[in-house]
Amino acid sequence: MASRSLGGLSGIRGGGGGGGKKSLSSRNAAVERRNLITVCRFSVKTLIDRSCFETIDDSSPEFNNFAAILEQILSHRLKGQVTWFGYESPRSFWDYIRVACRKVSQNCICSIENMENVSSSRAKGRAWIRVALMEKHLSEYISTALRDFKTTRRFYEDGAIVLGEEANMLAGMLLGLNAIDFSFCLKGEGLDGSFPAVIDYTPYLKYIQSSDSISSDEEELRTLGSSGSESSTPENVGPPFLMDENSWFNKCKRVKQKYQLTLEQKGYLEELLRLRENQLSESVSQNKILLQRIEDSDLAHKLEKEQLEYIIVELQDQLTVLKNNDLRSRQELTAHLTNQWPSPGALDVNAVALDTLLYRKHNKQWYEKSYQSLDQLSAEVSLSQTSLDPGQSQEGDGKQDTLNIMSEGKEDTPSLLGLCGSLTSVASYKSLTSLKSNDYLASPTTEMTSPGLTPS
């Protein structure tokens, strides 16, 4: 039991130690991120102040320090590149910028990739910082890269500055650099990527003594002065008055420093406000232009819709008129054909056709006669024509001889039925059909010799 309890206590201690290490590492990472962001903000302010008096170039210590700080921020907890053997090789922040900033319009990525005097990734990253500052698009590049969270997550580990809340602060503080005109030489020694960048913290380290510590120092001096002499003479009263004067001077100096710092912050915020106002005015103007375009397009679409509807209505009217005209034409054509070809009862007495044969058949004049061949039928028709019209007997004889010659060698088949009879009326065709059904064959020569070819 004792061994078990000791083991449990040791396990609890071990777990507490692991949790303490984890909290300590997270605290160190947070302090590191905060230090880099704070130093970057100071560096931006010093660059803005220096730009009021001189041009910022590669020889400016403020710019060199800013470039080193930005390089450290973009390289913070950057993942290494895994090789084929499973090892991680160091990687530069340029590999991340090259992928994440390709969506920026009119970017300089391809230009930096094609530079002849720059070969290493670190040197290309430093050249990109200088080109982006000269183009005044550094803040836009950083904002676009941070918005691509998937790519950022792929290149950086947990706890990196670009993955935390400090990333938004970084993109905001870099906006102030758009008001500075930079001038860099992309062939200088500053692009040498053989050594890492080192941050100089000394311009930003100043010891400021608090008012409580100053008062405590004065009390100590008074105590020491009073313990050195028991008599209170005017000579012994002098040092406290001098210390009071020095303390007021120190307080005035501190107030002046705070005022200068506030004035610098005010200038930075005013510049940032001007940039935001310009961006807002541009956005408003673009919004107005887009709204006007939308209204114009809506109006054009409405007009086009009305025109199409009018065209549809007009086409429907035309289609209705054409249908009516077509129906009227059909009716007129039917009436014309009906009036032009008379009925069988109104035919002339001299017109001889198959209707006459049908009439004689019904009167049992030819009831006992049957024609066995086409020649017999044509002869009988010619005899009947001669008996009806004696004046045309001679002419009919000549035509009959011609038809007999033409009919020689032809087969008595139903295919010749279409050539029989007169087409003067529909009743002739119906009479032909009735003759066929009663096994009667009409001679095709009757039509040629019949005077009923033409309508009366």
Curated annotation (Swiss-Prot):
<comment type="similarity">
    <text>Belongs to the RUNDC3 family.</text>
</comment>
<dbReference type="Pfam" id="PF02759">
    <property type="entry name" value="RUN"/>
</dbReference>
<keyword id="KW-0488">Methylation</keyword>
<dbReference type="InterPro" id="IPR047340">
    <property type="entry name" value="RUNDC3A_B"/>
</dbReference>
<keyword id="KW-0597">Phosphoprotein</keyword>
<feature type="modified residue" description="Omega-N-methylarginine">
    <location>
        <position position="13"/>
    </location>
</feature>
<feature type="region of interest" description="Disordered">
    <location>
        <begin position="1"/>
        <end position="26"/>
    </location>
</feature>
<feature type="region of interest" description="Disordered">
    <location>
        <begin position="382"/>
        <end position="405"/>
    </location>
</feature>
<feature type="modified residue" description="Phosphoserine">
    <location>
        <position position="216"/>
    </location>
</feature>
<feature type="coiled-coil region">
    <location>
        <begin position="300"/>
        <end position="325"/>
    </location>
</feature>
<dbReference type="InterPro" id="IPR004012">
    <property type="entry name" value="Run_dom"/>
</dbReference>
<feature type="modified residue" description="Phosphoserine">
    <location>
        <position position="215"/>
    </location>
</feature>
<feature type="domain" description="RUN">
    <location>
        <begin position="57"/>
        <end position="189"/>
    </location>
</feature>
<protein>
    <recommendedName>
        <fullName>RUN domain-containing protein 3B</fullName>
    </recommendedName>
</protein>
<keyword id="KW-0175">Coiled coil</keyword>
<dbReference type="InterPro" id="IPR047339">
    <property type="entry name" value="RUN_RUNDC3B"/>
</dbReference>
<feature type="compositionally biased region" description="Gly residues">
    <location>
        <begin position="8"/>
        <end position="21"/>
    </location>
</feature>
<dbReference type="InterPro" id="IPR037213">
    <property type="entry name" value="Run_dom_sf"/>
</dbReference>
<comment type="subunit">
    <text>Interacts with RAP2A.</text>
</comment>
